[in-house]
Regions:
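Non-catalytic, mostly N-terminal accessory regions of nucleic-acid modification and defense proteins
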Residues: 1-212, 278-289, 385-390, 411-419, ...
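Short, contiguous acidic/charged loop-to-helix segments that flank catalytic cores in large enzymes
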Residues: 32-35, 312-328, 358-366, 386-394, ...
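Conserved S-adenosyl-L-methionine
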Residues: 190-303, 308-310, 324-326, 330-331, ...
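C-terminal, active-site-flanking charged/polar segments
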Residues: 379-380, 392-440
């Protein structure tokens, strides 16, 4: 009889172990009737990981303080720390765990009655804006949607196996987290506003090129993709300990008013090594533009602001009378123009790289007035025209990248038409854009010459055309009548989008006039 071969267990790598923990946690969550798909599961997993991450970091800092003979104040007091209620596998579970997390007042893990976990975390505050404020902001809009306390205990036990004190594990988890954000965007379907393709983010940050010592802002931070990329870009410039210290303090700033993206953004930045994320949880457009002064300005803005949405009437009061619009992309463009630092000592001043829909390029009326200010007072030096489907299947609206600084006025605008890979007609969810595809554009960027992909238009020509920035490639041979059906459909879609914008503007006028 031939002896059976025993299967040799191959030790899992750190990446495989972490992937296994995350996947196991998500499988457990699928059994809970309170959760409905990845749109519920990822935020749930995020706040659990956030508390474990925080406790691991606190224990490291506490030990460092002891060795240095210094006092250490914990951000979270007992019995609300992870180590108090979550780290023991046989700890609080079932209905008691749900009650402890959800209720304003509950029996705590130490047996005493007091504030529930979320109620306590939301009440945290500090005098100098430390982690306690960050924690309170994170949990202000966070909800525990799991209803089975036994399943929740199983998830907590899984997450307890992640060691956030290991740099390798944090790096790996950061990558895993990005893949989960992509899945969340996929699950969101038409409302997938959380994720800008990483290759596009990397290209924008690469050409805007933030330098150590500069301040960087994303006024529509979402899940923090631009800030993470800017952090990685700046981290490579750090040569000394002091450099890294300055990078961590006051360099990166984001604004994200929606509770879910705010939580995801905080976690994304923490996992990538940003120790004190400075994310404002309120509306970026809440201040009158005229009140924005030098102290509010920054060196670099990289962003993909929302477009197609509408803002409340109170927000529109913050904008000049002749530039009020229902188009959020145009509102953010005006904000960005005010937020860029003025030139000092021969510098170009603040600079920006941002995503805009085609409607911004060809829009007239209020849109044209905003663009005229951009051309006359800023240096709009480059527009990169993106190919079809960069954001597919979430939107088919054609998009562009604007690059400008405060060294204006504009003399001419360079256009670069980013092509699709050879043989491709579109990007798709399974075959998205890759960073390597920007290699030719990056090579062209510093040695600009006209070519079949690049051309320039004088500002006089642009102003004479009513600030129409929607300039076609003069080398293009296709006539619209001979375009493929798919591209014709997109051209029609572009015009439909413009009609929607005009109708939104008419609606705004009717509301403001009280008609």
């Amino acid at each position: 009889m031939t002896p059976r071969k025993t299967k040799v267990e191959v030790p899992k790598s750190s990446s495989q172990q972490l992937g296994s923990i995350v996947n196991s946690s998500r499988k457990i969550m699928r059994k809970d009737k309170g959760l409905n798909g990845d749109l519920d599961r990822l935020p749930m997993l995020t706040w659990i990981m956030f508390l474990k991450f925080l406790d691991d970091m606190e224990q490291v800092r506490e030990e460092e303080a002891k060795l240095a003979g210094k006092k250490f104040r914990q951000a979270i007091d007992p019995p609300y720390r992870w180590r108090d209620w979550a780290s023991k596998p046989d700890g609080i579970t079932g209905p008691e765990l749900i009650a402890f997390i959800n209720q304003e007042e509950a029996v705590r893990p130490d047996g005493k009655k007091g504030s529930g976990l979320f109620a306590y975390l939301r009440s945290l505050q500090s005098a100098n804006g430390d982690r306690r404020d960050v924690i309170a902001k994170v949990f202000e809009g966070t909800v525990n949607r799991m209803i089975n306390g036994y399943l929740l205990r199983d998830v907590v036990n899984k997450v307890n196996g992640i060691h956030f004190t290991s740099r390798d594990e944090i790096h790996t988890l950061g990558q895993l987290y990005e893949s989960m954000l992509r899945e969340m965007r996929d699950a969101a379907g038409d409302s997938g506003e959380f994720y800008t393709p990483r290759p596009l983010v990397k290209f924008i940050v690469t050409v805007v090129d933030p330098v150590l010592g500069e301040t960087v802002l994303d006024p529509a931070a979402g899940t923090g993709g631009f800030l993470v990329e800017a952090f990685e870009h700046l981290k490579r410039q750090c040569k000394r300990t002091e450099d890294f210290f300055h990078l961590q303090k006051g360099t990166l700033h984001g604004i994200e008013p929606k509770p879910l993206p705010y939580l995801l953004c905080q976690m994304n930045l923490l996992l990538h090594g940003v120790e004190y994320p400075e994310i404002d949880p309120l509306n970026a457009l809440r201040f009158p533009l005229r009140e924005i002064g030098d102290k509010d300005r920054v060196d670099v803005i990289v962003t993909n602001p929302p477009f197609g949405g509408e803002e409340e009437r109170g927000i529109l009061a913050n904008f000049p009378e002749d530039k009020k619009t229902a188009d959020t992309a145009l509102l953010f463009l005006q904000l960005i123009m005010r937020k860029l630092r003025r030139p000092v000592g021969g510098s170009t001043g603040g600079r920006c790289g941002m995503v805009v829909p085609n409607g911004v390029l060809f829009g007239d009326g209020i849109c044209a007035r905003i663009k005229e200010e951009l051309l006359r007072e800023f240096n709009l030096h480059t527009i990169v025209r993106l190919p079809n489907g960069v954001f597919a299947p979430y939107t088919l609206i054609p998009t562009n990248l604007l690059f400008f600084d405060r060294s204006g006025p504009t003399k001419h605008v360079w256009y670069y038409e980013q092509p699709l890979p050879e043989g491709r007609k579109n990007y798709t969810k399974t075959m998205p854009i890759q960073f390597e595809e920007f290699a030719t554009c990056l090579a062209w960027w510093k040695k600009r010459q006209e070519s079949d992909r690049a051309w320039k238009v004088s500002v006089a020509d642009l102003l004479a055309s009513g600030c129409n920035l929607d300039r076609k490639n003069p080398q293009a041979k296709e006539d619209i009548a001979h375009l493929p059906a798919e591209q014709l459909a997109e051209s029609i879609g572009e015009k439909e989008q413009r009609i929607v914008e005009i109708l939104a503007h008419i609606k705004l006028l009717l509301v403001t006039q009280g008609l």
